[in-house]
């Protein structure tokens, strides 16, 4: 948790729009739940792998600065319904769900069967 706080402070110091809502969501949703890979890259503002496909493809969760920028520009409000195209391991959907709250809804669409199965499994846990 402290590592995420430190990351958010660095992003804010760099001028990124880390709002209280975004900060709360990123502190509440544990990214480790969405990947079995090392989090060191993510904590250093790099993408982190969440899935390697049988064909050799690598799927990643976006770097934190991209996640913060996306969430900021979505202008999310409690109770909103959100359609997310591209699952990114389920992490961004979980962040959005945290921000829109129990009165909101998040629907995720992804063209990759492997990604969809990964997200289903991770969101069940």
Question: In which residue ranges do the predicted regions lie?
Answer:
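Class I SAM-dependent transferase core
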Residues: 1-99, 114-122
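Conserved SAM-binding motif I beta-strand of class I
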Residues: 105-110
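Conserved SAM-binding strand-loop segment of SAM-dependent methyltransferases
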Residues: 125
């Amino acid at each position: 948790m402290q590592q995420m706080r430190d990351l958010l402070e660095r992003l804010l110091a760099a001028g990124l729009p880390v709002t209280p809502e975004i900060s709360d969501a990123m502190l509440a949703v544990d990214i480790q739940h969405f990947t079995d890979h090392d989090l060191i890259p993510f904590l250093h503002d790099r993408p982190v792998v969440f899935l390697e496909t049988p064909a050799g493809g690598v799927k990643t969760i976006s770097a934190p600065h991209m996640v913060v920028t996306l969430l900021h520009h979505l202008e999310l409000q409690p109770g909103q319904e959100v359609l997310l195209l591209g699952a990114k391991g389920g992490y961004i959907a979980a962040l959005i769900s945290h921000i829109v709250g129990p009165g909101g809804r998040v629907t995720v669409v992804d063209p990759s069967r492997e990604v969809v199965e990964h997200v289903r499994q991770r969101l069940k846990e």
